[in-house]
Swiss-Prot record:
Protein name: Matrix Gla protein
Family that this chain belongs to: Belongs to the osteocalcin/matrix Gla protein family.
4-carboxyglutamate modification, residue list: E21, E56, E60, E67, E71
GO terms under cellular component: extracellular matrix; extracellular region
Record's keyword annotation contains Transcription regulation: no
GO molecular function terms noted in the UniProt entry: calcium ion binding
Annotated signal sequence range: 1-19
The entry's keywords: Chondrogenesis, Developmental protein, Differentiation, Disulfide bond, Gamma-carboxyglutamic acid, Osteogenesis, Phosphoprotein, Secreted, Signal
Disulfide bridges in this chain: C73-C79
PROSITE patterns xref list: GLA_1, GLA_2
Coiled coil: none
Gla domain ranges (all copies): 51-97
């Protein structure tokens, strides 16, 4: 009986120590971690935003051929479904490569 009581007390202490939530373990003290649309970009300075937009324009201009092919395939539902099974290269070749050769 004594060992059962001791085991119960030890189990209760183990549960209390494991389930204890300290304030140090919290990831964020904020009530809501999400921002509304109006305040979403206030943490970036205008110069950083301009630089990010300029870099995005450069990336858009200098995309590799496989990325352009993938975007063309993403816009066409049948090509996208075929790509899920056989890959984007095979899907692009099936739906778009023949059309280019015919023109």
């Amino acid at each position: 009986m004594r060992s059962l009581l001791l085991l119960t007390v030890l189990a209760a202490l183990a549960v209390l120590t494991v389930c204890y939530e300290s304030h140090e373990s919290m990831e964020s003290y904020e009530i809501s971690p999400f921002l509304n649309r109006r305040n979403a970009n206030t943490f970036m300075s205008p110069q950083q935003r301009w630089r990010a937009k300029a870099q995005e324009r450069v990336r858009e201009r200098s995309k590799p051929a496989y990325e352009l092919n993938r975007e063309a395939c993403d816009d066409y539902k049948l090509c996208e479904r075929y790509a899920m099974l056989y890959g984007y290269n095979a899907a692009y070749n099936r739906y778009f490569r023949k059309r280019r050769g015919a023109e």
